[in-house]
Every structure is written in structure tokens, then in C-alpha cells.
Swiss-Prot record:
Protein name per Swiss-Prot or TrEMBL: Syntaxin-binding protein 2
GO cellular component, one term: presynapse
Physiological role: Involved in the protein trafficking from the Golgi apparatus to the plasma membrane.
GO biological processes: intracellular protein transport; neutrophil degranulation; presynaptic dense core vesicle exocytosis; vesicle docking involved in exocytosis
Tagged with keyword Thylakoid: no
A UniProt-annotated Pfam family: Sec1
Keywords recorded for this protein, A-Z: Protein transport, Transport
GO molecular function: syntaxin-1 binding; syntaxin-3 binding
InterPro entries found in the cross-reference section: Sec-1-like_dom1 (IPR043154), Sec-1-like_dom3a (IPR043127), Sec1-like (IPR001619), Sec1-like_dom2 (IPR027482), Sec1-like_sf (IPR036045)
Gene: STXBP2
UniProt xrefs under PANTHER family: VESICLE PROTEIN SORTING-ASSOCIATED
Similarity comment text for this entry: Belongs to the STXBP/unc-18/SEC1 family.
Gene source species: Canis lupus familiaris
Subunit structure: Binds syntaxins 1A, 2, 3 but not 4.
Length: 593
């Protein structure tokens, strides 16, 4: 079976390209990693998968470890000064080294000075393998990637970091190129015209990809691959999406609940005394995958239906499938504890979201949607937006960040307000402590103060959508329009120029694809997708509604296209505002993530 998504592609690359490539029957090895490589591995492989491949122990290179001189070690490391020094130190020992021999795999290109240092050390005598596997990104979901570089927004957009910008662009470009190479893609590269940084990053990615292509001329070959594209877009193209209260399950939960490192914590009651449970929300949970993009209004209904079907399939009758009922079902069917716990978790999560929604969020959603759309539920243009926002700004019960979200949406709708008006709005809302955060939207290309009254907006033109929506979920992320135009080959070439000429599309492709279908095998024997991919990189963080759009557009093409989206990091609205807050600060004044 072909890998179904990014996590599987990366997992296969680590298992085949690293661990199995040095595996010998009946021989155990130690796996040593640093923090970045551990994050990559844990995002796509289970510990049991690793141990099943003849690995006896997995260790952190930066922690004190017991020497095991009888075993060989596999090192999977990022090529940094700290990790290379720790690696050299493992083979400095007398009378014995920490391990018998070293198989070294760097996640990316090792800088020349570090390489020289390695070759001059005692380690050089016992190195059996030394490879660069070019895997400098995290597969966050099947169609979502992260470069795990949340600080890059600050480096790219803060005026005090202009000197860092070129270096940051080079680093991001290298990471994006490793993503394309891992997927066997050599896409045509396009960028949103306007901001300098999008063109700079697009050109830098092309240079890095050309270097990969020189090493591996077959990169990007195969039926239909010539249609693959990489789009570089900046957060300023759509500052609205990360500000809205989204009502689809994943985005809503991450916005309203305290979910850290994808872990949802909640109190369980019923079976005995209350206790805290921690549940990882990831793609190993098929129920989460089924529910995460659903509107909250449909989630509880769906879980209840699925639970009922499950109980009926096990010949158990239930009256009301609610949480209290679940503990009663569990007593009757203890053997299905794992499955029932899953239903219980998602009922809890949905319930938790609804409690917050009914509390204060519901009244904000209508205002936010009207401001984002510029029209009300009837499609009538908003004539007096000030009337909409004043009750929210004056309401002491609304938290500061929620007021700021509404304020920024108002400013974006008006395409800037006068200095005097801005001061009044900030005072009404009582968010004086955050006035620089609001002004920092300008660093992303938004207009905050506009002395001559409302100016002309540089927003991208929107598609008209006629499909029915929930009244509080009328907004569609701009990026979804862009994805649809790209896969239909309707993206405006003036607004989205190519940095390299697109490959000519010829009728011969159809014949080839009929021969190969959408999959072909690469050298390692792993099936790779042969249909075209649209890869989108958003500078400044990607919102969860935009992640959802990638799946929706893929589905709408019946799998002819696969849309991937990613960024330096994943945004929640709070995270987006926290990022904005730093954009006028000096490095020594902030704690970067």
C-alpha cells in the first residue's frame, strides 16, 4: 500500500533509510537522538515500531548515558554544533568508547567546519555510516507539515531583525526543499506578488531544490509530476482567518481549551472518584480524524450515533448514549474499555467546547463573521460596523484578547482607521496595554492607521460561494480560494508569478498516467504518489481552518490532486496575537518560543 500521507512517508524514510539500512539479524543497536530529531521521529513513529527493528534503547544525546561498549549506535541528529560536540565526546573516552561503532545520520546538510571537526576526531576510526537524510520538517498531520521554527515570524517581520532576515529565509528554504525532496517533488514555484519576503523565499527554495536535483536527477520525474506546484504565501494575504472563533471541532478546541502539545486534559467522573485524564489528539485516533473538521453542531450527534452503532454491533442496548450512560455500559462491557474511552473523550471534548461557546463566545461569533464578510447573514452590506463592535468593546466580561480580535477585524474591514479613532477604540475596549500589538498588524502588511480615511485594500479577490453554511461559519479562508484556483489552473500569473517557468503541460501526460495510475515505486521500494501535489507554505504560521481547507480541496478533486499545507508553526488565535505582540520588541525584551 502506498503511504497515506506525510507521517507515513516520513516514518518509512526513517525506518528504511536509517534503521533498516544498518540492521543486521540478531544484532541489537542503540538509537541516540537530539531534541529536533526526537520531535521528527515521535511525530511519525511509535516507540514499539523502533524497538521491533532491533533497537534496544533510545537515548537523548544531551543526557548522561551509561556506556554500552559492546553495542553499535545509530545517531540520528540535527547537524548543530551542540549535537556534533556531544557525538565527538562519546568517542573521546579511555580506555573504551561509549559504543562499539557509530552509524551517523544527519537530518540535513552538515556544515563544512563541523564535518572537518568530525573527521579529525577519534570518532572517525569507528564510523561505519555517515549520511545526510534531508528531513528537516515535522509531519504534523497527513497533509500538514511544520518547520518547527516559531521564532521565524519574529525574524522575518520585526524591524529590529532586518539583519537576520536573509539568514532566516535561507534556513526556511532549506527546510522546505527537504520536504519536496522527501516527497520526490520538483515543483514549479510561485509566490504571492507584493511583499518582498515571498519572492525572496521562493527564489531561495528554487536554489536549494536545484542543488537536490543536481544530486538526484530523477527528482520530480514521473507521470503528472510536472504539474506539481509550490506556492509561497504570506500571513498578510489573510490576517482574518487566524482571528476568528472557528466552530469546527479541531480549531474550536485548540482555540477555547487549554490543549498543549496536542494533549487534552479533563476530569473523568462516574466509575469511581474523579481523576484527570490526558489524551493525545492525533491521527492514531481514527475517531478524531473523522470528527476534527466537522462543525461542532454535528460532532456530539455524530459521536452519539457512532456509539449507538458500536453498542448495537456488540448486541448491547442503550437508551441514551451520554457520558453517564457510558460508565454504565463500561461495567457491562469491560473488554471494550479502549473503544468506549475514545467515545467518552470526544463527547467530553465537544461538551467542553459547547460550555465555552454558550458562555461568551456565541455572541462574539456573529459580530466576527459580519466583520470578516463585510455583510450580514442576509448578505446585506454592513453599513455601521462601529455599532456592531461597541457592545463587545464595552463589555467587561469579554477577555482582552477577544476584544482585540474584534478590534483587528474591524480595522481590517475598514482598511485602517484614523489615529484618533484608534486611540478611542483602544480606550473603550480598555486594552491600552496591548496597543502596540494592534499596531503591529502593519508589520504583516495590514493597514492599521489610515489618515485619509478608508483606503483601497490589497486583499485578494474572493470566490462567490453558494453552498449553504452555518450562520456563524460563513467565512472561508482566502487560502481555500487560492488552492481551488491552483488545482484548476486558474491562478492569476500576474498576482502569483513563477520563479521558474512551469513545465509545459502536454497531452502525453494523460497517456503516461493511464499507464502508471497515481502511484509508482521509488528506489527503496516504497510506493510514492505519482499524481500532482499542491504544496502551500504560509509565512508566519498556518491557521487550523486553512489546514482543513487542504483536506477539503483534495477531497473535491477525488484524489487527483493532493494538497499539502504548512508553515513555521501551527497557529491558534492566541498564538497569532502573541506573535504580533513581539513584532516591535527588541530580542532581549522577549521570550521567544
Amino acid at each position: 500500500m502506498a503511504p497515506s500521507g506525510l507521517k507515513e512517508v516520513v516514518g518509512e524514510k526513517i525506518l528504511n533509510g536509517v534503521i533498516r539500512s544498518v540492521k543486521k539479524d540478531g544484532e541489537w543497536k542503540v538509537l541516540i537522538m537530539d531534541h529536533p530529531s526526537m520531535r521528527i521521529l515521535s511525530s511519525c513513529c511509535k516507540m514499539s515500531d523502533i524497538l521491533a527493528e532491533g533497537i534496544t534503547i533510545v537515548e537523548d544525546i544531551n543526557k548522561r548515558r551509561e556506556p554500552i561498549p559492546s553495542l553499535e549506535a545509530i545517531y540520528l541528529l540535527s547537524p548543530t554544533e551542540k549535537s556534533v560536540q556531544a557525538l565527538i565526546a562519546d568517542f573521546r573516552g579511555t580506555p573504551t568508547f561509549t559504543y562499539k561503532a557509530a552509524h551517523i545520520f544527519f537530518t540535513d546538510t552538515c556544515p563544512e567546519p563541523l564535518f572537518t571537526e568530525l573527521s579529525r576526531s577519534r570518532l572517525a576510526k569507528v564510523v561505519k555510516t555517515l549520511k545526510e537524510i534531508h528531513l528537516a520538517f515535522l509531519p504534523y498531520e497527513a497533509q500538514v507539515f511544520s518547520l518547527d521554527a516559531p521564532h521565524s515570524t519574529y525574524n522575518l517581520y520585526c524591524p529590529f531583525r532586518v539583519g537576520e532576515r536573509a539568514r532566516q529565509i535561507e534556513a526556511l528554504a532549506q527546510q522546505i526543499a527537504t520536504l519536496c525532496a522527501t516527497l520526490q517533488e520538483y515543483p514549479a514555484i510561485r509566490y504571492r506578488k507584493g511583499p518582498e519576503v515571498t519572492a525572496q523565499l521562493a527564489n531561495a527554495v528554487l536554489a536549494k531544490l536545484n542543488a537536490f536535483k543536481a544530486d538526484n536527477p530523477s527528482l520530480g520525474e514521473g507521470p503528472e509530476k510536472t504539474r506539481s506546484q509550490l506556492l509561497i504565501v504570506d500571513r498578510g494575504a489573510d490576517p482574518v482567518s487566524p482571528l476568528l472563533h472557528e466552530l469546527t471541532f479541531q480549531a474550536m478546541a485548540y482555540d477555547l481549551l487549554n490543549i498543549e502539545q496536542d494533549t487534552y486534559r479533563y476530569e473523568t467522573t462516574g466509575l469511581s472518584e474523579a481523576r484527570e485524564k490526558a489524551v493525545l489528539l492525533d491521527e492514531d485516533d481514527d475517531l478524531w480524524v473523522e470528527l476534527r473538521h466537522m462543525h461542532i453542531a454535528d460532532v456530539s450527534k455524530k459521536v452519539t450515533e457512532l456509539l449507538k452503532t458500536f453498542c448495537e454491533s456488540k448486541r448491547l442496548t442503550t437508551d441514551k448514549a451520554n457520558i453517564k450512560d457510558l460508565s454504565h455500559i463500561l461495567k457491562k462491557m469491560p473488554q471494550y474499555q479502549k473503544e468506549l474511552n475514545k467515545y467518552s473523550t470526544h463527547l467530553h471534548l465537544a461538551d467542553d467546547c459547547m460550555k465555552h461557546f454558550k458562555g461568551s463566545v456565541e455572541k462574539l461569533c456573529g459580530v466576527e463573521q459580519d466583520l470578516a464578510m463585510g455583510s450580514d447573514t442576509e448578505g446585506e452590506k454592513i453599513k455601521d460596523a462601529m455599532k456592531l463592535i461597541v457592545p463587545v468593546l464595552l463589555d467587561a466580561a469579554v477577555p482582552a484578547y477577544d476584544k482585540i480580535r474584534v478590534l483587528l477585524l474591524y480595522i481590517l474591514l475598514r482598511n485602517g482607521v484614523s489615529e484618533e479613532n484608534l486611540a478611542k477604540l483602544i480606550q473603550h475596549a480598555n486594552v491600552q496595554a496591548h496597543s502596540s500589538l494592534i499596531r503591529n498588524l502593519e508589520q504583516l502588511g495590514g493597514t492599521v492607521t489610515n489618515p485619509g480615511g478608508p483606503g483601497t485594500s490589497s486583499r485578494l479577490e474572493r470566490r462567490e460561494r453558494l453552498e449553504p453554511t452555518y450562520q456563524l461559519s460563513r467565512w472561508t479562508p482566502v487560502i481555500k480560494d487560492v488552492m481551488e484556483d491552483a488545482v484548476e489552473d486558474r491562478l492569476d500569473r500576474k498576482l502569483w508569478p513563477f520563479v521558474s517557468d512551469p513545465a509545459p503541460t502536454s497531452s502525453s501526460q494523460a497517456a503516461v498516467s493511464a499507464r502508471f495510475g497515481h502511484w509508482h515505486k521509488n528506489k527503496a521500494g516504497v510506493e510514492m504518489r505519482a499524481g500532482p501535489r499542491l504544496i502551500i507554505y504560509v509565512m508566519g504560521g498556518v491557521a487550523m481552518s486553512e489546514m482543513r481547507a487542504a483536506y477539503e480541496v483534495t477531497r473535491a478533486t477525488d484524489g487527483k490532486w493532493e494538497v499539502l499545507i504548512g508553515s513555521s508553526h501551527i497557529l491558534t488565535p492566541t498564538r497569532f496575537l502573541d506573535d504580533l505582540k513581539t513584532l516591535d520588541q527588541k530580542l532581549e525584551d522577549i521570550a521567544l518560543p
